[in-house]
Amino acid sequence: MEPLTRAQKELFDWLVSYIDETQHAPSIRQMMRAMNLRSPAPIQSRLERLRNKGYVDWTDGKARTLRILHQKPKGVSVIGELKGGELVEADAEEVEKIDFAPLMKKSSVFALRVMSNDLVDDFIVEGDMLILRSVTGEEEIEDGELVAASIKGGKIAIKRYYQDGTKVVLKASNNKGPGQELKASDVEIQGILMGVWRNFQGV
């Protein structure tokens, strides 16, 4: 790609850092503050140059759609797939990357350590770390999702969540019965399960 001027590189490096940390594009005003500029014109000019040189792109007419192009993938390499217990290696030129860093930077993500085998029916065992994200007030929770829930401000427990009209049903993983039916107002969802971290190194 065509090289950048010092001013263009300064803005580009800041954009890469900002988007990597926040997972969304900044506003023009934020770019102005970061570059110590009082007018949007220089920012818009630099952005156009970055776009023409193939470093960034955005959707015209829509705010905060700027994205970085041709960024080198980060994270853990997925070197292949296991089928029937045998490794099928991935194409060396098309190795997928899984980047956990953006997830871990979000303030809405938290972890709970599992200290029993009560969740074994969900393939979660003692020592596992549950990775959850906080729930916003307006968010709809899908039936059957594993959630961290508290009842009337009590202790938090991991349950499967079901909505039944104005009521909520919470079911324990090891309970084959109908579950606990509660008023929705009595249940506070602290988080939704995103994934499970299992460490085989004994750390």
UniProtKB/Swiss-Prot annotation:
Disrupted-gene phenotype: Probably essential, it cannot be deleted. Depleted strain have decreased levels of hox hydrogenase. In depletion studies using merodiploid strains 32 genes are up-regulated while 25 are down-regulated; many of them are known or predicted to be involved in carbon metabolism; cells grow poorly in the absence of inorganic carbon.
Primary site of residence: cytoplasm
Key words, A-Z: Activator, Cytoplasm, DNA replication, DNA-binding, Repressor, Transcription, Transcription regulation
Entries under InterPro entries matching the protein: LexA, LexA/Signal_pep-like_sf, LexA_DNA-bd_dom, LexA_repressor, Peptidase_S24_S26A/B/C, WH-like_DNA-bd_sf, WH_DNA-bd_sf
Binds hox promoter DNA: region residues: 1-88
GO CC terms, sorted: cytoplasm; protein-DNA complex
Pfam families tied to this protein: LexA_DNA_bind (PF01726), Peptidase_S24 (PF00717)
Molecular function in Gene Ontology: DNA-binding transcription repressor activity; sequence-specific DNA binding; serine-type endopeptidase activity
GO biological process assignments: DNA replication; negative regulation of DNA-templated transcription; positive regulation of DNA-templated transcription; proteolysis; SOS response
Modifications made to the protein after synthesis: 5 protein spots of the same molecular weight but different pI are seen in vivo; all of them bind DNA.
Gene induction: Expressed in light grown cells, strongly repressed post-transcriptionally by UV-C light, repressed by H(2)O(2) and SeO(3) but not by SeO(4). Strongly expressed in dark-grown cells, induced in light-grown cells by glucose, repressed at 20 degrees Celsius. Not induced following UV light exposure between 150 and 600 J/m(2), suggesting it does not respond to DNA damage. Despite changes in transcript levels, protein levels are constant under light-dark regimes, anaerobic growth and in presence of glucose (at protein level).
Subcellular location: Cytoplasm
Family label: Belongs to the peptidase S24 family.
Leftover remarks: This bacterium is considerably more resistant to UV and gamma irradiation than E.coli; the E.coli-like SOS regulon model is not an appropriate model for DNA repair in this cyanobacterium.
Subunit structure: Monomer in solution, probably binds DNA as a dimer.
UniProt domain comment: The N-terminal fragment (residues 1-88) binds hox promoter DNA.
PANTHER family registered for this protein in UniProt: LEXA REPRESSOR, LEXA REPRESSOR-RELATED
Function: A probable transcription regulator, probably involved in carbon metabolism. Binds and probably regulates expression of bidirectional hydrogenase (hoxEFUHY), probably activates its transcription. A possible regulator of redox-responsive genes. Binds 2 direct repeats of the DNA with sequence 5'-CTA-N(9)-CTA-3' in the upstream region of both its own gene (includes the transcription start site) and crhR (includes the initiation codon) in a sequence-specific manner; does not bind crhR RNA. Binds to the crhR gene, represses its transcription.
Name the record gives this protein: Transcription regulator LexA
Source organism: Synechocystis sp. (strain ATCC 27184 / PCC 6803 / Kazusa)
Organism lineage: Bacteria, Bacillati, Cyanobacteriota, Cyanophyceae, Synechococcales
